[in-house]
Amino acid sequence: MKYFKFLIFIILIFTNFINASALIGPNDEIKIKKIEIYLNQNYANTDTTTYPLTKGMLNNTLSNKSYDVDHILYRQKVNSVFENETKRHEIKLNVFSEILPVRNIDDAWNGKNSLSYQISYQGNNLTYQFKISSYENRVNKTDYHFDESYIAYTNWNLVFGFGSLNRWWGPTHNNNLILSNFARPSPGVFVQSLSGFEFDGLLSFIGKTNFSLFVNRLESNRAVPNPYLIGSRMTFIPFNNLQIGFTRTMMIGGENRKENGDILIKAFFGALEGADNIVGSNERTDLNSFEHDPSNQIAAIDVKYDFLFKNNLISFYVQK
């Protein structure tokens, strides 16, 4: 609740002079596919494996042809798919007999029956979205949450924000190794690239590079209450149609565990030496063993290749 109050406070402060940059969630995956087909037709590509995406990234994909007819038509295509609305209200009602055990990329986390109201605003530099949902939990009681509410600011080709975002990191449509919508999003801060970075010289071969980083606070009803969840992902597009992604997440800190820079450094670099996620001599992980088990983390790599066949988009991918 304290995160929600803080979010409302920020929105009230900036409502009168907001300019915004939109975040595109995994529920808009069908729209993104339309953009991907158009890009493949024009021999271009952009990162579509790290949701939420940014509209700035889509708009700037052909920015090196800013006065080219192809780029003008592409911008019109993006604007036609994602309506240029500065303010939007949305009400959704979902009715299910059971909680969905399997979800696709465009499914939101909900209980058996849910009702949600959403208001969003976007402009040039600052955007916000407020969403409140009521749903039936597993014991058939009505509960409320503010998932998918956030506020974000754009500058220096970066997006900074705070909120609870649905993330889908990976090339698939119905499952991922690490981050998907199978669990509710947790509140936290995040930063990600807006339209990607390109390097000259020796690093030019890696192509356009995008990154996303977040630090979230998890819930209290777990073995170690209220740990931090840190997630990072980098993607590279060395040439058109090929996307390579690297993902890493770690849980660190929590009740009765250290939360400082030393532990973070030990967790980040110690994993490379096999000093993380270890089991003690008694074949059990000691929750208080900060020195030998500073965090719980996993990593993944994925590769996606797209091509057109008779105006149909075909994708091959692998993740490990």
What are these regions (language model features)?
Residues 47-48, 102-108, 136-140, 177-180, ...:
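Outer-membrane beta-barrel domain signature
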Residues 109, 128-153, 171-180:
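Surface-exposed loop and membrane-interface regions of Gram-negative outer-membrane beta-barrel proteins
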Residues 25-37, 74-132, 160, 209-213:
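Transmembrane beta-strand segments of Gram-negative outer membrane beta-barrel proteins
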Residues 47-49, 80-90, 122-126, 154-157, ...:
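Short loop/turn motifs that connect adjacent beta-strands in outer-membrane beta-barrel proteins
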Residues 95-101, 123-125, 132-138, 155-157, ...:
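Transmembrane beta-strands of outer-membrane beta-barrel pores
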Residues 168, 188-320:
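Signature for the C-terminal beta-barrel architecture of outer-membrane proteins
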Residues 107-115, 142-147, 183-192, 226-230, ...:
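Residues that define the transmembrane beta-barrel architecture of outer-membrane proteins
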Residues 7-16:
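Bacterial N-terminal signal peptides
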